[in-house]
Every structure is written in structure tokens, then in C-alpha cells.
């Protein structure tokens, strides 16, 4: 069997994440198509005393997917298993892309996911394993919509987890960082298909912060972008609607100016950083100075173009800490004249009871900072990242699991009331740590091993 399984793997395969900020070369790279193949790969890994890392589409802008041992991509394990139109639930294999659900499966059955993030090129397993979220005060992270999981343990045993079977595992398995096993299938609770009406309006940072609760609760899915080096904010007030679609687009404007020209200007700013404040002001004036309305299918409003390669860092904080964090960040940027790119994205998520959820037991706000990498150029960002982390850490910040952070179990045990409970479940499910890589070894305070290259 060993030779048969080894022949399924590729050696010398380099894995690079979408942002091209992390890469690794696993000893063997697998793309299994069946549950039995996954089981045999795990058995072979045990035989050879190898770690196993399961990866999706590679959108995580950190080293969470990297390993030098065995890597399993679920890109071929991606079928839709069942659509239950009565319960409004969809069951898929772990590698099924949200894009497939959005474009084909859910519209064909008059269904939709209740909330989504910015990107749809994500696997179902990856979305729930890293705590992917959208925005909306009454909407949780996508993991909170999990109603059933089938999980393959390191032993090859597949267990079912839901509110009736192994229910004690559900708060851990719904967001596990891939540390409990391989997600064979996941069932997500959906709702009837719906359209969204997004009204984009300008505002000031001070006004939004002073009236934050009003803004957050007056829309189904409220978020705002702050443009550093300005007082300017663009608010996105998004609500469900039965109105007909209303979409206006221009390739020249959206791509020519909004993508290609911006990339050129930001590339010049790598030589002349003092240009960044002017670029931020220019693009706010070009794209945000007037009100814009869009009505479209829900996923087309939730998802948006993330433009070109980038560094990002995102933290979740208690909702009542938004003002103090943003004012401290703004003050630091201005005092140090750091050329911070736009936007600082601010979103809002309902609290939940998932052990490793950044929203555990609190309604939360996610604040995402960004530094673009025009034409894949290396851009200085470390001091910005370190300062932002120090600011949010003072105010109970919890990092987005898919993104860069320097925290370890020492910090997490103080931030997550159910940290010890999760660790006990992980050690029982995977006693030999097969599913740990360097990223997770840092998180759980095990001995780290090199697994990635960083740029």
C-alpha cells in the first residue's frame, strides 16, 4: 500500500498562497478524490511519522497552510452531496468552493448563504476552519451556520458531529484551524435566496464613531472604510430587498482607474512614500465622494474585488472598543507619518458560542489594515503591523486565524474562556499532533518546526 499511496503524491511541488507572501515545499503533495484515498494518505503519514496539512484555495495571507511534511489539497474532493430545499441546507465535500455554490448550486435551488466575506474562491472546509466572516450585527461568522460535520481523525475513523450526535464536539469542530482532522463533509444552514440593496455614502470618522450603534443597527449588513491620512469614511448601508437588480459598471473606471492606475501609482509610492496620502485622498474623491446604490443577488454584493497582491492584518475587538482603537491607530499613523494604504476596513459580527471564534461570547468588530504589493513589490509594513497589534492587544483583541499575528497559547488562554476545553478535545482527537504545522505549534505552544518561506 505504501508504494501505491506514495505514487499519488507529488514531490517538489511548491505551494504559494494567493498573496505570494508565504510558500513551502511539502515532502509530498496529494490531491485525493475519494474518502478512501484520504484515509490511506493518513495511514501512510502515520507509518512514516509525518505531519499532514490540509489546504484549500490558498487565500489565507499567513503560513497557516504551510508544511514541509505531507500536504493534502481538497481541490478534487469538491462535490455537492445534498441540497435540502425543505430545511434550506446544503451538504458539500470539504473542497467545494463557495463560488460553485454561489454561481450554480444555491441559485438553482432558490437558496443563499445568509452572510459571506469578500472572497468566494474559498473551500467550505477552509471557510469554517479559519473563522471567515462577513458583516452584520445579527449575523455570525460562517462557522456559526454549521449544522453537521463529518470529520476524519488521524486514525482514519470518520465521526459525525451535530447537535444530536457528538454534540459536545460541535463548538470545537465548527472552527478548529484544521487541528482536529480532515473535514470530509459540512452541512451549512442557508436561507431563501435574496437580493441586497447597498447604499454607499460618505461620512467622517468622528461622526461614524460617535453614532456607531445607530449605524450598525440600522442596516442588515453595515460596514465602513476609513481612508488613512484623511478624516473621510465611506459607509456601506446594506439591506435585504425585493427590488429589481440595479447595477452600473464601467471597465475603464472600475479596472482601468480602480485597478491598473492605482497599482501604478502605488508602485511609484514605493520609491516616494510621501505620495500615499495624496493617492488616498485622490481615490476617495474619485470613487467615494458621491453616493452610489447597487441592487443585486446577495453574493454579488457580499463579494468584492480584492485587487492585487497585498499584506493584510485583521483583529476582532469588542464592539465598544472601536472608537478608541481607531483613534489610537490614526494618531500613530499621523505622528509617525507612516504611508498607510487605504482602506482600513471595519465590519461587525454577532457573538457566538464557538470555542475558538474571535466572536466567542461577545458582539465584535473586525478591523482590517492593508498594505498593497503593486506588481508583487515588497512593501515595508512591519512597524505598522507591530503597532496595530500592540493597540488591539490592549483592548482585548483576538486575531483573525487566517491572518498574520504573533500571539501564542500564552496569550490565547487569557482571551478564550474555552481555550483549555478546546485543547483537551484536540489532544484527544489527535494525540500525536499529526495535524499540527509550525503555525499551529506556535498557537498551541508546542515545539515549532520550519515550514514556510515569508516575503
Locate each region found by the language model.
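Noncatalytic alpha-helical scaffold of FAD-dependent oxidoreductases
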Residues: 1-455
Amino acid at each position: 500500500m505504501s508504494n501505491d499511496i506514495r505514487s499519488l503524491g507529488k514531490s517538489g511541488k511548491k505551494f504559494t498562497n494567493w498573496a505570494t507572501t508565504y510558500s513551502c515545499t511539502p515532502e509530498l503533495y496529494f490531491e485525493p478524490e475519494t474518502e478512501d484515498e484520504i484515509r490511506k494518505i493518513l495511514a501512510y503519514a502515520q507509518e512514516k511519522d509525518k505531519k499532514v496539512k490540509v489546504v484549500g484555495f490558498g487565500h489565507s495571507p499567513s503560513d497557516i497552510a504551510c508544511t514541509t511534511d505531507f500536504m493534502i489539497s481538497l481541490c478534487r474532493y469538491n462535490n455537492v452531496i445534498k441540497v435540502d430545499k425543505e430545511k434550506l441546507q446544503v451538504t458539500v465535500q470539504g473542497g467545494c468552493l463557495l463560488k460553485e455554490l454561489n454561481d450554480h448550486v444555491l441559485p438553482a435551488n432558490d437558496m443563499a448563504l445568509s452572510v459571506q466575506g469578500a472572497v468566494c474562491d474559498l473551500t467550505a472546509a477552509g471557510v469554517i476552519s479559519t473563522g471567515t466572516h462577513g458583516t452584520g450585527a445579527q449575523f455570525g461568522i460562517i462557522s456559526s451556520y454549521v449544522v453537521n460535520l463529518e470529520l476524519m481523525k488521524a486514525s482514519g475513523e470518520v465521526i459525525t458531529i451535530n447537535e444530536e450526535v457528538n454534540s459536545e464536539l460541535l463548538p470545537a469542530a465548527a472552527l478548529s484551524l484544521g487541528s482536529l482532522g480532515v473535514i470530509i463533509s459540512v452541512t451549512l444552514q442557508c436561507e431563501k435566496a435574496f437580493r441586497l440593496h447597498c447604499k454607499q455614502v460618505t461620512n467622517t470618522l468622528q461622526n461614524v464613531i460617535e453614532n456607531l450603534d445607530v449605524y450598525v443597527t440600522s442596516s442588515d449588513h453595515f460596514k465602513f472604510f476609513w481612508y488613512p491620512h484623511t478624516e473621510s469614511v465611506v459607509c456601506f448601508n446594506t439591506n435585504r430587498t425585493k427590488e429589481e437588480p440595479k447595477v452600473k459598471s464601467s471597465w475603464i473606471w472600475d479596472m482601468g482607474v480602480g485597478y491598473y492606475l492605482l497599482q501604478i501609482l502605488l508602485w511609484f509610492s514605493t520609491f516616494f512614500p510621501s505620495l500615499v496620502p495624496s493617492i488616498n485622498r485622490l481615490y476617495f474623491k474619485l470613487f467615494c465622494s458621491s453616493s452610489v446604490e447597487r441592487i443585486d443577488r446577495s453574493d454579488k454584493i457580499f463579494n468584492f474585488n480584492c485587487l492585487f497582491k497585498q499584506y493584510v492584518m485583521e483583529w476582532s475587538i469588542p464592539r465598544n472598543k472601536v472608537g478608541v482603537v481607531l483613534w489610537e491607530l490614526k494618531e500613530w499613523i499621523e505622528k509617525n507619518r507612516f504611508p498607510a494604504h487605504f482602506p482600513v476596513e471595519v465590519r461587525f459580527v454577532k457573538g457566538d458560542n464557538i470555542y475558538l471564534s474571535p466572536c466567542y461570547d461577545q458582539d465584535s468588530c473586525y478591523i482590517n489594515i492593508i498594505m498593497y504589493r503593486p506588481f508583487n513589490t515588497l512593501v515595508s509594513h512591519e512597524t505598522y503591523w507591530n503597532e496595530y497589534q500592540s493597540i488591539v492587544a490592549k483592548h482585548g483583541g483576538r486575531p483573525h486565524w487566517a491572518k498574520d499575528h504573533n500571539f501564542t497559547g500564552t496569550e490565547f488562554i487569557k482571551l478564550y474562556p474555552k481555550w483549555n476545553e478546546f485543547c483537551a478535545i484536540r489532544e484527544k482527537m489527535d494525540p500525536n499532533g499529526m495535524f499540527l504545522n509550525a503555525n499551529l505549534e506556535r498557537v498551541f505552544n508546542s515545539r515549532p518546526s520550519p515550514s514556510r518561506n515569508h516575503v
